[in-house]
Amino acid sequence: MTALNHWQPSADIKNHLKRAKIIAKIRQFFTERGLLEVETPVLSEFGVTDLHLSTFSTEFLAPFGEQSKTLWLSTSPEYHMKRLLAAGSGPIFQISKVFRNEEAGNRHNPEFTMLEWYRPHFHMHRLINEVDDLLQQILDCPPAESLSYQFVFQEYVGLDPLSAERSELIEAARKHNFMAEDNEDRDTLLQFLFSEVVEPQIGKERPIAVYHFPSTQAALAQVSPEDQRVAERFEFYYKGLELANGFHELADAQEQRHRFELDNQQRQKCELPTREIDERFLAALEAGMPDASGVALGIDRLMMIALDCEKINDVISFAVDNA
């Protein structure tokens, strides 16, 4: 097919109409609960240090002969939204385009739509309940099940992820066709076993919230004060899709800097370019971000379930190969 006649949208117009109604319902859900809708930049002077995220960049050609500078396309509005929290915004939500320079396929498009919201003074389980409320309202689905990472890992892998020996994890991974080296990183093994063994077996009949991921996978979440082995982080799964990723947010600027530095050390080990640390974000934490929980939810995947579609292309206007 030539570019000349490859002009039709990826999704049917009927799905565009249904999508618009669902977006309106999402906005109504949050405005009725008193959250402020915000807009933040999709271009930033800072990328992200996360080892597992590949970021698009562009060059800003500054006027009047000034030196051009690299700008990064947002992988999430998280840092900017937390700066708003620190400035006193109160509870906020955003529906925005985000970009990840990764695969395109049935469940992925490098440009996609994300719903992200933050709740000052909410603990993790209270936010889990609110995500559950939203899913029930939008998808008309049963209430979510809520189980710990440790429990579901033991249930389906047969090992305790918090205490198993690395050799046991290597053996389990090899049974599932992962070519694990003898010195394989523990988190790599846990992530493989969770994604390949656990995820396909959970959330089939109703959504499931998996909480208390290992503290080594805390990202921007607080470590649990009750059990230092786990982080106050959760993810939602339903019908074979990872839908949402949430945290009881880390507000300690010094600890966050340390984690960013560890990210860059890992990047060097993997022969990946390091990323400049977002000093504006850290300054906001230093100034005092309120205790809060936040979550990011993939709108396009939500639409796939709501519209009973197998491919992400069926719920977005133009996929990357047709943009």
From Swiss-Prot:
Pfam families: tRNA-synt_2. Substrate binds at S76, P77, E78, Y118, E249. One of its GO terms (biological process) is lysyl-tRNA aminoacylation. Belongs to the class-II aminoacyl-tRNA synthetase family. EpmA subfamily. NCBIfam families: genX, PRK09350.1. It is an enzyme of class 6 (ligase). Signal peptide: none annotated. It catalyses: D-beta-lysine + L-lysyl-[protein] + ATP = N(6)-((3R)-3,6-diaminohexanoyl)-L-lysyl-[protein] + AMP + diphosphate + H(+). The keyword ATP-binding applies. This is Elongation factor P--(R)-beta-lysine ligase.
